[in-house]
Amino acid sequence: MALTGFRAGRQTRLDYRARRHRVSTAVGDNEVIERIDAFCDAVPRRRARPDEYGPLVIFVPTGSGWPYYARPRRGSRPPVTAADIRAVRARQRELVIPESFEWIEQTAPEMAAAAAEAGLEVQAHPLMMLAGPVHVPPLPPGVTVRIIGPEDPELDRVWAVPAVAFSHPGTRAGEAGAAERDKIAADHDAGTIAMLRERLRSGHSVLAAVFGPDGPLAAGSCQAVDGVAEITGVGVLPTERRRGLGAAVTALLAADARDRGVQTIFLSASDDAVARVYARIGFREIGTAMIAEPAR
């Protein structure tokens, strides 16, 4: 599915064949997975035109912004084959959009093998839902966490935090920090920030960040459709990792979504180590989020 957060958040490639036998579902999980799958189909339709190709659908961008993925059609459909994926890849090349596919493994179990046969690299990520109360982790001294409004003067620097984080993948501490964040913020495209500001005004997205004396240190976002919300793009400056800041952002976004009446709150973890962090907040693994794209 491409869970909309996968692309920003993935950092580690996991063997989808190994994961398939590790995920056990509880009573009611299939219903939750169905709601999440509907969410992943609905979100791209806000800013893209759906074009169906056999059992798959491509979301063709209708304006600026991040290009979307292809995914299995919802409802009754034939199984996805390698030939279907090759046909969609050809169309994606014609449209000059990424040859990317995202789906939930439990809704299209045949698709991983088809994607691999079609020459794509297949990645698997823990799909998790908030299963109880939000456990808010303690913050280190000298930092605060808050929701960011559309007119917040720090909006551009908050936006830049995940850009730095995901250009230095992994969870280990590193040297990139405030200077890199501020450079990206200074060089930002005004249209991108304007689009983000509009999404915050409309309520389509919620943004949160952790702040220290030198500005934003961690950030993430959440978007909701029809009672389902995804937390996505949680990133921490490499200089600030291993301090619980990403967990603080995630917990605030989850609590905020619940306060707004959202019933199903989910996310995807980049790997099992990150999944354990989310588990301490109150998330539980219910399935597997899949990505397939050309090997880099």
Cite the ranges covered by each PLM segment.
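A conserved beta-strand-loop-helix scaffold within acyl/acetyltransferase catalytic domains
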Residues: 177-178, 187-235
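Conserved active-site alpha-helix within GNAT-family acetyltransferase domains
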Residues: 108-122, 247, 271-288, 295
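N-terminal charged segments
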Residues: 2-96, 107-108, 112
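Conserved acetyl-CoA-binding loop-helix of GNAT-fold acetyltransferases
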Residues: 81-89, 233-238, 242-255, 259, ...
